[in-house]
UniProtKB/Swiss-Prot annotation:
GO cellular component, one term: plasma membrane
Keywords: Cell inner membrane, Cell membrane, Electron transport, Flavoprotein, FMN, Heme, Iron, Membrane, Metal-binding, Transmembrane, Transmembrane helix, Transport
Coiled-coil features, chain-numbered ranges: none
Cellular location(s): Cell inner membrane
Major localization listed first in the record, in broad terms: membrane
Gene for this chain: msrQ
Membrane disposition: Multi-pass membrane protein
Keyword Lyase on entry: no
GO BP terms: protein repair
Function: Part of the MsrPQ system that repairs oxidized periplasmic proteins containing methionine sulfoxide residues (Met-O), using respiratory chain electrons. Thus protects these proteins from oxidative-stress damage caused by reactive species of oxygen and chlorine generated by the host defense mechanisms. MsrPQ is essential for the maintenance of envelope integrity under bleach stress, rescuing a wide series of structurally unrelated periplasmic proteins from methionine oxidation, including the primary periplasmic chaperone SurA and the lipoprotein Pal.
DNA-binding keyword on record: no
Protein name, per record: Protein-methionine-sulfoxide reductase heme-binding subunit MsrQ
Amino acid sequence: MRLTAKQVIWLKVCLHLAGLLPFLWLVWAINHGGLGADPVKDIQHFTGRTALKFLLAALLITPLARYAKQPLLIRTRRLLGLWCFAWATLHLTSYALLELGVNNLALLGKELITRPYLTLGIISWVILLALAFTSTQSMQRKLGKHWQQLHNFVYLVAILAPIHYLWSVKIISPQPLIYAGLAVLLLALRYKKLLSLFNRLRKQAHNKLSL
């Protein structure tokens, strides 16, 4: 049985709740001592993990829609991507304001250079910013064929974000490894497309070098 347009609307409502409820829990935890001994780190890790969850969920939609034969499921992909960007922005903001502090924001550039895992994180965020800004149908029409080329960069985020997470933790625990494994699995489901993209980029690079 295929999803109807009305069911997709209700599914989107549920996804909005899934994006909002963690924020409400975080606010409650901050105000009621629900965080650990290092609340700043807990906030950073919580916001980062939530962003990663929405990224993986967005990547899951296409293969799920294909294998389950639910084409309307694709309509939820943009929403998941926007929630991923929202939580990634909270993650970046929590680092800038809580870790560095308002008076030390000038140090952010130095931090990005001296801590490579932060570089991976900011690259991922900039890509997500571009994808969020161009996610509307009007931008899709305006960019034409370049729209898909731009949004293929989500696969780069799917590589960089788990590495950023793994690199940022001092002690490797099962959790970041699970996220990394899920990202690898979701990318593996697209190996034909990724191989095609790689070959196209290699051909373009070869042509430019030959000029």
